[in-house]
Amino acid sequence: MFKHVTVLLKETVDGLNIKPDGTYVDCTLGGGGHSSYLLSQLTEGGKLIAFDQDEIAIQNAKEKFSSYGEQFITVKSNFRYLAEKLQEIGITEVDGILFDLGVSSPQLDTPERGFSYHHDAPLDMRMDQDAPLTAYDVVNSWSYEQLVRIFFQYGEEKFSKQIARKIEAYRENKAIETTGELVELIKEGIPAPARRTGGHPAKRVFQAIRIAVNDELKVFEEALESAIEMVKPGGRVSVITFHSLEDRICKTTFKRNSTTPQLPPGLPIIPDEFKPKLKLITRKPILPSDIELEENNRARSAKLRIAEKR
C-alpha cells in the first residue's frame, strides 16, 4: 500500500486560495495527501491534474480517487514537462499549482529503490524507474572531481574530498553495488567526532547522489518558472522544500518575479514587461507546527512558500 504522511497539508492547499470550480495541478502526487484534500474542496466544475514519475503512485491514486471520474487526471511524467503535458490535454492556464519536493515515504521505505541509508539495497535512487542513470552509475563511473562537486554542491558535505577518495580507492578493486557498501565508505571518509553529530553520516551524500541521478535542482528551477507562466492572474503557486538548495531556488525565483527592476527615473508608467509577475503571499516560509513535528519527524526540514500571480 502506498502510504505517506503529508507535510503541511492544510497550509499548502489552503494557501492556494481554492476556487471550487477551478483547475489545479499537483506536481508531486506521491501518496495523494495534498490531492485528496484539494479534491474535497472542488465542485463538479473543478479539476485536478496530478503528476508523478512513479507508476505505483499513479495506480494507487487512480484507485483511491476513482469516484471523482474526469475531475481527477493523472500524468505519468517528470514535472519538468509540466507545460507541454498540460497542453497535450488541452490546458493552457490553471488556477493553482503545488509542489511537494523530496522523496515520498513509500520510496524511502521500499528498500529495493535504494533511496535509504537504513536498508541495504542495490544502488538505484531513480524517481522514474525507466530513467537510464542510476546511483550505481554515479558512484562507479563518475570521476573523483565530479563526485567531490556533487557531494559539496548538492549535499553541502564538508568531507566531500575524503569520501570521494574512499570511493575511488574501493572501486579500483570492486564495484560498489549496494547502499550498505556505500554507507560504510562514507563513514570511513568522515572523522569519528563528526560522525557523532548532525544525524546519519550518510545523509548528505545520499541526498547529493539522489539530486544528481534525478537532476532535481535544474528540473525544479525550470518547472517553477513554467508554473509561474501557466497560473492565471490571481492564481497561486505553493512550494514545499526540504533542503536549503531547493528553498534557495524557490526564494530567488519568487523574489525575482515579484520585484520591479531598476528603471530610469521619471518614467510616467512602468512598461508591462517590467511589471512584477508575482505578489509574495509568504515573506518568510511557513514551517510545520510543533504538533506536526511530533507526529511526523520527516517534516522537520520542510518550508512552505506561496506566491500569487498578478
From Swiss-Prot:
Top-level EC class: transferase
Catalytic activity, reaction form: cytidine(1402) in 16S rRNA + S-adenosyl-L-methionine = N(4)-methylcytidine(1402) in 16S rRNA + S-adenosyl-L-homocysteine + H(+)
Binding site for S-adenosyl-L-methionine: G32, G33, H34, D52, F79, D100, Q107
Transmembrane segments: none
GO biological process terms on file: rRNA base methylation
Alphabetized UniProt keyword annotations: Cytoplasm, Methyltransferase, rRNA processing, S-adenosyl-L-methionine, Transferase
Entry GO terms, CC: cytoplasm
Subcellular location: Cytoplasm
A GO term, aspect molecular function: rRNA (cytosine-N4-)-methyltransferase activity
NCBIfam families given in the database record: 16S rRNA (cytosine(1402)-N(4))-methyltransferase RsmH
Biological role stated in the UniProt entry: Specifically methylates the N4 position of cytidine in position 1402 (C1402) of 16S rRNA.
Protein family (similarity comment): Belongs to the methyltransferase superfamily. RsmH family.
Protein name: Ribosomal RNA small subunit methyltransferase H
Organism of this sequence: Bacillus cereus (strain B4264)
Encoding gene (name): rsmH
